[in-house]
UniProtKB/Swiss-Prot annotation:
It holds the Pfam family NAD_binding_3. It catalyses: L-aspartate + NADP(+) + H2O = oxaloacetate + NH4(+) + NADPH + H(+); L-aspartate + NAD(+) + H2O = oxaloacetate + NH4(+) + NADH + H(+). The gene is nadX. Coiled coil: none annotated. This is L-aspartate dehydrogenase. GO terms for biological process: NAD biosynthetic process. The keyword Oxidoreductase applies. GO terms for molecular function: aspartate dehydrogenase activity; NAD binding; NADP binding; oxidoreductase activity, acting on the CH-NH2 group of donors, NAD or NADP as acceptor. Specifically catalyzes the NAD or NADP-dependent dehydrogenation of L-aspartate to iminoaspartate.
Length: 257
């Protein structure tokens, strides 16, 4: 079997976990190229899998089949267009960037013109398959309540506090590195979902509670995520979702909507 050649943009917590799985033979892909603004971080990960750190994303594009963006919303705006123009598939982890309708439309058009695909993993929550299915009927409401330790939000406080209550489109602007979940929910059902963000010193995990109501009935999910040791803003589940997506691309049966 010819292995898919993969490059990574952004060598932080998610890239670390992906690289470890590939190194251990648990994901059948070739992880060949790494890009990060901090060259040393890229070199460290590349050394784990006999890969190559590059100084520019363009340097990997002639060789790869797919690129994993695991950097930032800015990387989605600045680098993903170049990847799609080269006809390469891309996995977008910084899904909050896709809440910008003009950017999203432009990227989808580039993908279409260049026979490429944009993959968005389910990230740090469960239930996106059910939400996508429910969106084929009439959805009445979708609400996300997120509780996080203050430290993971870069703040310090002794009491629980509601930091935000409103729509997902505004939440991703105020918390661009912390609320990709809200964006994933909105994109999955094509509506600006209701969001509440709570800083709670009593919790030590990132907790996401999703409630969906519609003509199908109702479902509710609660995900209590362990945070990555490398970056407490990132949930381990988010990395696992990207890893499973990469693995599924080489499989001949796909389970779930």
């Amino acid at each position: 079997m010819i292995l898919m050649m993969v490059g990574i943009v952004g060598c932080g917590a998610i890239a670390n976990l992906i690289t470890g799985f590939v190194r251990d033979g648990r994901v059948p892909v070739k992880l060949g190229f790494f890009y990060d603004r901090d060259l040393e971080r890229a070199e460290n990960l590349a050394s784990m899998v006999d890969g190559r750190a590059v100084l520019d994303v363009a340097d990997m594009l002639p060789e790869v089949d797919l690129v994993v963006e695991a950097a930032s919303p800015e990387a989605v705006r600045d680098l993903v267009p170049e990847i799609l123009e080269a006809g390469k598939d891309v996995v977008v982890m910084s899904v909050g960037a896709l809440m910008d309708p003009e950017l999203r439309e432009m990227l989808v058009e580039l993908a279409s013109l260049n026979d490429a695909t944009i993959h968005v993993p389910s990230g740090a929550i469960v239930g996106l398959d059910g939400l996508k299915a429910a969106s084929m009927g009439n959805i009445e409401s979708v609400k996300l309540i997120t509780r996080k330790p203050p430290r993971s939000l870069g703040i310090s406080m002794d009491e629980k506090k509601v930091l935000y209550r409103g729509r997902a489109s505004e939440a991703v602007k105020k918390f661009p590195l912390n609320i990709n979940v809200a964006a994933a929910l909105s994109l999955a059902c094509d509506r600006d979902v209701d969001v509440e963000i709570i800083a709670d010193p009593a919790v030590d995990r990132n907790v996401h509670e999703v409630t969906v109501r519609g003509d199908f009935g109702e479902f509710k999910t609660i995900t209590e995520n362990v945070r990555c040791s490398v970056n407490p803003k990132t949930s381990v589940m988010a990395a696992y979702s990207a890893i499973k997506l990469l693995k599924s691309l080489s499989e001949n049966i796909h389970i779930g909507t």
